[in-house]
Amino acid sequence: SKDSYPVTKFHSLVVPKRCIKNYFELNDKEILACDDLIKKLQQKISLEDSTVKGFNVGTNSGKVAGQSIFHCHIHVIPRREGDVENPQGGVRSVIPSKQHYIRKK
């Protein structure tokens, strides 16, 4: 389904049918089904929009992690060149003070 407050165009949600609070309550079969759907979404979005060059895939599990809807859902967020000034660090940006790091060679 589409996110009600999309971060980018085609920001989508994978929502399991079973009513559970978060990703960690999914069983193995549900995880595989979600993963399959995530891959299909990635392919569909990439074919539909050639400006998409990457994806963020993630879930918020628990109030302190930013979860506000307590039914498991997984975000699939298409990314494009220039949608942020510096994408380095990716999901590390959830804690702003930790988003900058030095790569060890």
Predicted regions and their residues:
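HIT superfamily nucleotide-processing domains
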Residues: S1-K105
